[in-house]
Amino acid sequence: MELFVWRQILKNLILPPTGPLLLAIAGLALTVITRVRRTGIVLCAGGLATLWALATPVIADHLVRAAERYPALDLRRPLAAQAVVILAGGVRVDAPEYGSSAPNATTLERVTYGARVARATGLPVLVSGGRYEAQAMQESLQRDFGITPRWVESHSHDTRENALLSAAILARDGVQKVVLVTSAAHMERARLEFSDAGIASVPAPAALWTRREYGLLGLVPNPDALLRSQRALYEALGLLEHRVRIMLVSPTAARGAVVPATQPASPQGPPTEHSPPKAAPAA
């Protein structure tokens, strides 16, 4: 099984709802099976209380707001960038109403805003994601927004590979700075990965948090709030993983192994798909 799959399994076991539920189950087991009743009760109550808190809109939105570190991009100001890069966030495989794969809600938010940025700036577009994600993004941009991506990166599995493989493609056309489009909570991690890959970026966050008035409903758990908490904590785990990796591995060495020497820019043409470089496997 690929390392990527094991990493996703581990993250899902830590994140809500699974993490707090496992904590509560462990506490219940200690209470019933062993004599450590006090510790078991504390763990069980702590797991259930954590799950309740993370499912409330007030807590969820505080976590999301903390994860979003960049304001909305002002498209009226000139941007010193050479391309727009849109990152995938999931896909609906074989969506029956489209007759093919289609972007999920997260990816569609990014694609919609990426199209707006591309139109406002006139910059060429690169879409980056897995095989189905990249294809769905390309088709959506063409069908729904009349924009044909110049580059398609369709081999990445995570944000790090988004950055490494996109950097390798962009370097062939001499692109060193991009407008980076992704979800607001994901932007910090995405920018760090692109910086490590040798690409400077202007943040163009999509789906920014907006202030809400809750009243008592803000303290009542709901599935949407739990999902927002999960996404915010997922990004916190991703940033922690990035920091640990940077401490263990030289980012300069990683860049040199992946990004090829810059080549003269190619003329405008149909979207091109590139195979991933073979020199540096993902961590």
Q: What is the predicted function of each stretch?
A:
Residues G19-A26, L43-A53, L233, L237:
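Lipid-exposed faces of alpha-helical membrane segments in multi-pass integral membrane proteins
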Residues L48, A53-A225, S229, L248:
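A structural signal for short, hydrophobic/glycine-enriched beta-strand patches
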Residues A253-A283:
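Compositionally biased, proline/threonine/alanine/serine-rich low-complexity intrinsically disordered stretches
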Residues D224-A253:
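Structured C-terminal subdomain patch of bacterial secreted/periplasmic proteins
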Residues V32-G40:
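Membrane-interface helix-boundary motifs at transmembrane edges
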Residues E2-L10, I59, L63-A67, L233-L240:
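Hydrophobic alpha-helical segments of integral membrane proteins
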Residues M1-T31:
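Membrane-embedded alpha-helical segments of integral membrane proteins
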